Amino acid sequence: MAKLTKKMKAIKAGVDSTKAYEINEAIAVLKQFATAKFVESVDVAVNLGIDPRKSDQNVRGATVLPHGTGRTARVAVFTQGANAEAAKAAGADLVGMEDLAEQVKKGEMNFDVVIASPDAMRVVGQLGQVLGPRGLMPNPKVGTVTPNVAEAVKNAKSGQIRYRNDKNGIIHTTIGKADFSPEQLKENLQALLAALVKAKPTTAKGIFIKKVSISTTMGAGVAVDQASL
């Protein structure tokens, strides 16, 4: 097992792992230890009351955070005709069909999000082995396969996050940067939790959101008291 650095030991010593912190206090703790030479991301882990082994209980979707994520996504759009012009006008970084597919096959993937109109899936479908492992394959469940590509581009550019539970039923995503104000981080977290509650599977029983923890890129997790949200 790797030894803890002095910084990580100090962080762990400053966080009570048995306590669920009031949200403003939790954010203050994160900011206190966010001392990396770069602006750290603020990540969240949400433990859900689901059985991830059952396909009808898996949670997947997307939501736009009110204050964004602190970074602007590069967006590639597979579409043609009027939709291509609309995508460009909405701010898409790359737009095309077979020509864009050829770039992807060559490993030229300078983008963070891939959007496709339904008629373009015949082209995108051939890229599954390349885009799939990177989590870039367009999917109607998260709004990246849509006839309204312009709206999807605007959402991606304005701070939309995608989420999907892992094999343990936990959602991992980002809610901003360490230099966001406490209110911005709180409102982003509230928006995410509201989206998750809305996406609750009808077959999930009992407490749905069981635990919420936030952390910075280089920091320890801090449990959040949900009553403070």
From Swiss-Prot:
Top-level taxon in the UniProt lineage: Bacteria
This protein's UniProt keywords: Repressor, Ribonucleoprotein, Ribosomal protein, RNA-binding, rRNA-binding, Translation regulation, tRNA-binding
Gene Ontology biological-process annotations: regulation of translation; translation
Pfam family, one: Ribosomal_L1
Keyword RNA-binding among UniProt keywords: yes
Hydrolase as UniProt keyword: no
Cellular component aspect of the GO annotation: cytosolic large ribosomal subunit
GO MF terms held by the record: rRNA binding; structural constituent of ribosome; tRNA binding
Family listed: Belongs to the universal ribosomal protein uL1 family.
Stored PANTHER family: 54S RIBOSOMAL PROTEIN L1, MITOCHONDRIAL, LARGE RIBOSOMAL SUBUNIT PROTEIN UL1M
Subunit structure: Part of the 50S ribosomal subunit.
Function field: Binds directly to 23S rRNA. The L1 stalk is quite mobile in the ribosome, and is involved in E site tRNA release.
Entry protein name: Large ribosomal subunit protein uL1
The organism of origin for this protein: Glaesserella parasuis serovar 5 (strain SH0165) (Haemophilus parasuis)
Higher taxonomy: Bacteria, Pseudomonadati, Pseudomonadota, Gammaproteobacteria, Pasteurellales
Gene: rplA
